[in-house]
Amino acid sequence: MGRDIVKNLKFKKHAGKHFDPEKFAQLLDESYRNTKRADGEMTKKSFSPSTLGYGHGTCPRYWYMAFSGAMFIDDNDAVAVANMAQGTQAHERLQKLISTMPEWKAEEEEIVNEYPPIRGFIDLIMEYDAETVIGEIKTAKQEVWDQRQAEMKPTTNHLLQLLTYMKLKNAKEGFFLYENKNTQELIVIPVSMNEKNKAIIEEAFTWMCEVWDNFKEGDLPMRPAGASKSKMPCTYCPIKKECYAGLTGTVQIESYKVPKL
C-alpha cells in the first residue's frame, strides 16, 4: 500500500461545507503519481551507472530481460515521486550555482561507452590545474546525511556511479556534494582513483561484460539463489511481474557483489 502524501487527515474531521480536504489530498496524490513515467514495454540498450550496485541493478536476469525488452511497471507512490522531484530541483539549483565558478566546465554531460554498453549523464565536470574532476550531486534525509558526514564516505552504489564516470573520462579525482534535505546543509566528499577504487570499478566492468556477453549469446539467467518478490534484489524491480511469470532460465550468473567500503 502506498504512503499517504498528506498525513493529518486520519485524526481530525473537517467541519467546512465547501472545501473537502480528503478529496483535495486524493487529487494531490493522483497528481504526483501522474507525473511518473507511464508503464509499458521498454528495451534497454545499455547499463545505467545510477542503477548499478543497488537492488535489481545487481541482477543479471534483470539486465538480460531489460536488454531483451520487458514490461516496466513503476510502483513508486506519491511520496517517492515527491522525493525524486525534490532531488531534481536540488540538482538544478546547485548546478546553477556551481556553473558560476571559473573551474566549471559542463553539467549533465552525456557519456557513452561501447563495451560494455553504458550510458549516463555526469552532474558536474570541473577542471583544476588542467585536470578533469567529476562531481556528483546527491540529496539525503537527515539520518542518511548524518551517516555520510560521520563516515565521510558515499554509499556504495553512489561510489560505483562516480567511479564509472571517472574511469570513462580518465579522471583521477572526483567528489560528491551531499545536500541535507531538511536543512540544505552541504558536505563535500572527495574521491580519488586509488588502487582500491580501481579494483572496485574494474571488477564492476568485468561483471557487466559477462552479463552483456551472456545476453548476446541468448541464455536467460535464472533468478538469484533464494530470490523472492519481497526480498532484494527483487523488491523494487520494475519488471518483477514479468520476471516471475516467465521461464526459469538456463544459466546461473552470479549477482554483482557490492563491495564493502
Where are these regions (language model features)?
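Metal-dependent nuclease catalytic cores that hydrolyze phosphodiester bonds in DNA/RNA
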Residues: 1-134, 140-147, 261
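"Short basic amphipathic alpha-helical interaction patches in structured regions
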Residues: 147-153
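Metal-dependent nuclease catalytic regions and adjoining charged, substrate-binding loops involved
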Residues: 9-25, 152, 164, 168-261
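Short, small-residue-rich loop/turn micro-motifs
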Residues: 138-139, 180
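Short, conserved glycine- and acidic-residue-centered signature motifs
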Residues: 154-158
